[in-house]
């Protein structure tokens, strides 16, 4: 009996902590404006290019006063035909407003990142969206 009660308590604590983690993640993502960027490198397998890009991008994101959520990703090993895994890096940022995203475009940290890394990519596609 005692073991069942302890087990139920542990399951309850674990379940409530998982809900809290989900809520924290949801609260950190500002739903007002999302900015998704895909980069295709000229030399996607070049380790030095990747290291340069990652260092510059992390420096930029640490110094951006406008970007809220900051996610950097690489393509997964896609197994479904509908998944485009042709890009080298993805970047997902959220902003409190379209105006904040516009200000981010001209902030110094963003411009320095572009200057440092624009020679690495051959293609960039941006998808912006406003929350509903």
Features from the language model and the residues they span:
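Sec-dependent N-terminal signal peptides
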Residues: 5-13
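Short S/T/G/P-rich N-terminal loop/turn motif that feeds into the first structured element of a domain
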Residues: 18-68, 72-88, 96-102, 130-132
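Surface-exposed, polar helix/loop patches in the mature regions of secreted/periplasmic/lumenal proteins
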Residues: 89-132
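Hydrophobic alpha-helical membrane context
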Residues: 14-16, 109
């Amino acid at each position: 009996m005692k073991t069942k009660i302890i087990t139920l308590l542990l399951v309850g604590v674990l379940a409530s902590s998982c809900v809290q983690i989900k809520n924290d993640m949801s609260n950190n993502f500002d739903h007002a404006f999302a900015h998704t960027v895909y980069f295709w490198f000229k030399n996607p397998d070049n380790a030095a290019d990747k290291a340069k890009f990652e260092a510059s991008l992390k420096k930029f994101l640490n110094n951006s006063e406008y970007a809220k959520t900051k996610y950097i990703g690489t393509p997964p090993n896609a197994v479904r035909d509908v998944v485009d895994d042709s890009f080298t890096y993805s970047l997902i940022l959220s902003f409190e407003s379209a105006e904040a995203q516009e200000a981010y475009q001209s902030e110094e940290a963003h411009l320095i990142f572009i200057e440092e890394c624009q020679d690495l990519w051959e293609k960039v596609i941006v998808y912006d969206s406003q929350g509903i």
